[in-house]
């Protein structure tokens, strides 16, 4: 499988690497990591990365995006990483490339690229890229190894989630054969400003229960604006405040935005992906997302989740 992907990459002198909007550690790690791999193994190629700002993961080396003029795409290859749907891809210019290639580990939603390499057995897209590098015997650079390891760590929940397998640790071990500082990665992931800690405390106090084992947070546009932070930080960043609560098997973070109600679903027990798909979203079995039209849709989703848990919704 990976030899075919390598053949596609070899065929183009100009390559632009895309990933999903509002990047997490896996999106950035796979993007930076693949770019570093290609640059070190094929120095004659012009490889660039594009997308919106790194946000919370700006500490990652190589996280500043490249300037790419529109005409660069003529005759170029666009690589799409860690993305299951076209509307999630950051920078729509991938459509103008001569050829497209996708690597992804999400549950399949739609065909996006001319050539696709997707495999849900990987805990992260970074794990998939690491396997690609290993099986095709590409030279691993310190930046590539560090970036890919970072994405594996973040998408596996520091190797805690069910998607973590022996394959995960084997690939992590493979990456660690190339010298880089693990302490720098964890310092970036765990170090928080006082304001961030206070923000989390504020959201802990907002946690409510829809049933015995289903928890949620709902944040209005006015409440979000009062925090002084962006909606993505609230939506993706605060869903974790409900994790590891005894007796809570499903938790959802709803955040009103200009584009609708952002929804982050998580579970320690159930496959909540079908619920996300029902509401136009997607993702993984136990970590998915969607954008809802309004608060009433959020209530409907909560009722569906309570039914999944076999409980009566108290809304």
Predicted regions and their residues:
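Hydrophobic helix-and-loop "lid/oligomerization" segment in the mid-to-C-terminal part
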Residues: 2-19, 29-58, 70-75, 154-315
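Generic enzyme active-site microenvironment
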Residues: 18, 22, 80, 102-103, ...
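Short glycine-rich anion-binding loops that position phosphate/pyrophosphate groups of nucleotides
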Residues: 21-23, 83-86, 106-108, 221-223, ...
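Short glycine/serine/threonine-rich phosphate/pyrophosphate-binding segments
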Residues: 25-31, 87-89
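Glycine-rich, phosphate-binding/catalytic loops in enzymes
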Residues: 33-35, 95-98, 118-119, 170
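Active-site cofactor/cluster-binding pocket
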Residues: 61-115
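Short alpha-helices
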Residues: 106-171
């Amino acid at each position: 499988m990976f030899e075919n992907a390598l053949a596609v990459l070899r065929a183009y002198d100009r390559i632009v690497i895309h990933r999903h909007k509002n990047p997490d550690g896996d999106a950035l790690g796979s993007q930076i990591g693949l770019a570093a791999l290609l640059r070190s193994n094929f120095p004659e190629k012009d490889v660039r990365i594009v997308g919106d700002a790194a946000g919370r993961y700006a500490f990652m080396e190589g996280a500043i995006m490249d300037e790419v003029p529109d005409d660069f795409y003529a005759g170029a290859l666009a690589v799409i990483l860690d993305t299951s749907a076209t509307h999630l891809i950051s920078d729509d210019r991938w459509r103008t490339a001569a050829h497209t290639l996708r690597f992804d580990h999400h549950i399949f939603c739609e065909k996006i690229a001319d050539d696709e390499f997707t495999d849900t057995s990987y805990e992260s897209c970074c794990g998939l890229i690491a396997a690609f590098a290993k099986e095709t015997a590409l030279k691993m650079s310190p930046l590539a190894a560090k970036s890919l390891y970072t994405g594996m760590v973040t998408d596996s929940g520091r190797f805690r989630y069910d998607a973590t397998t022996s394959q995960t640790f084997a690939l992590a071990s493979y990456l660690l054969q190339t010298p880089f500082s693990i302490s720098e990665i964890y310092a970036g992931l765990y170090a928080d400003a006082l304001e961030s800690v206070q923000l989390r405390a504020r959201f802990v106090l907002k946690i409510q229960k829809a049933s015995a084992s289903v928890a949620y947070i709902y944040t209005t546009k006015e409440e979000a604006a009062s925090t002084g932070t962006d909606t993505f930080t609230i939506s993706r960043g605060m869903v974790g405040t409900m994790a590891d609560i005894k007796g809570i098997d499903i938790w959802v973070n709803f955040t009103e935005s200009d584009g609708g109600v952002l929804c982050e679903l998580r579970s320690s027990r159930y496959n909540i992906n079908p619920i996300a798909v029902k509401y136009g979203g997607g993702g993984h079995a136990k970590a998915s997302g969607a954008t809802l039209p309004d608060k009433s849709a959020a209530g409907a989703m909560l009722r569906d989740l309570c039914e999944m848990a076999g409980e009566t919704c108290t809304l």
